[in-house]
From Swiss-Prot:
Keywords: Cell adhesion impairing toxin, Disulfide bond, G-protein coupled acetylcholine receptor impairing toxin, G-protein coupled receptor impairing toxin, Hemostasis impairing toxin, Neurotoxin, Platelet aggregation inhibiting toxin, Secreted, Signal, Toxin. This is Gamma-bungarotoxin. Residues 1-21 form the signal peptide. It comes from the Eukaryota.
Length: 89
């Protein structure tokens, strides 16, 4: 009986997805070679892009991050959300 119970516990642990965390690109650069593990509760990868006007003219800005929810798009702001590892490249 103890062997059966132990077997069931082991099978349950193996079959469960214990502690999976999302991997997302997290940077403020145009290219982003590295990824980071998202904190608990943030299982969406986000890529935001917009054009910033500075003294040297317009420049495309991009920010990649982990998020709990997909933020809304706004005028002049493009938002891309996804739910697989490093999908916000």
């Amino acid at each position: 009986m103890k062997t059966l119970l132990l077997t069931l516990v082991v099978v349950t642990i193996v079959c469960l997805d214990l502690g999976y965390t999302m991997q997302c690109k997290t940077c403020s650069f145009y290219t982003c070679p590295n990824s980071e593990t998202c904190p608990d509760g943030k299982n969406i990868c986000v890529k935001r892009s917009w054009t910033a006007v500075r003294g040297d003219g317009p420049k495309r800005e991009i920010r990649r991050e982990c998020a709990a929810t997909c933020p809304p798009s706004k005028l002049g702001l493009t938002v891309f959300c996804c739910t697989t590892d490093n999908c916000n490249h």
